[in-house]
């Protein structure tokens, strides 16, 4: 499975998990989107329908800082733009915050959702807090795994409603 990183050089290089993926030869840098482009602003949610594209072409992660990101950074990237459904960060910088995943967490989530669970778990070993991300989101990841976009959006709405009730 191919993993591509578009690096906008806005992240602290010491904490940048996208660069770490490249350094470990799990991913390679690119300037163009290929396959499924993970885009937090996308209208379409990642689902089992994307499994074939992920396996044949790959996954593109845009590595940028959450503090400086905007929709315009994603606008001109070609590929199948997909949004990861609600999950909570396990990384020390954004721990417990919904949607604010690191590049490696986004990749782990993508692999899990398209039913590449073994690969996702193996990848979680790359960072100290990788297993924390999976444990924190285990129930959600299992609920999203191999589901249609409609099913995933329904689960996501239920989660958001529960959060808003509190």
UniProtKB/Swiss-Prot annotation:
PANTHER family, per database record: 18S RRNA AMINOCARBOXYPROPYLTRANSFERASE, RIBOSOME BIOGENESIS PROTEIN TSR3 HOMOLOG
Family assignment from sequence similarity: Belongs to the TDD superfamily. TSR3 family.
Binding site for S-adenosyl-L-methionine: 17, 62, 84, 99, 103
Reaction(s) catalysed by this chain's protein: an N(1)-methylpseudouridine in rRNA + S-adenosyl-L-methionine = N(1)-methyl-N(3)-[(3S)-3-amino-3-carboxypropyl]pseudouridine in rRNA + S-methyl-5'-thioadenosine + H(+)
Chief location: cytoplasm
Cellular component terms (Gene Ontology): cytoplasm
Protein name, UniProt field: 16S rRNA aminocarboxypropyltransferase
Keyword vocabulary terms for this entry: Cytoplasm, Ribosome biogenesis, rRNA processing, S-adenosyl-L-methionine, Transferase
EC number: 2.5.1.157
Stored NCBIfam families: PRK02287.1
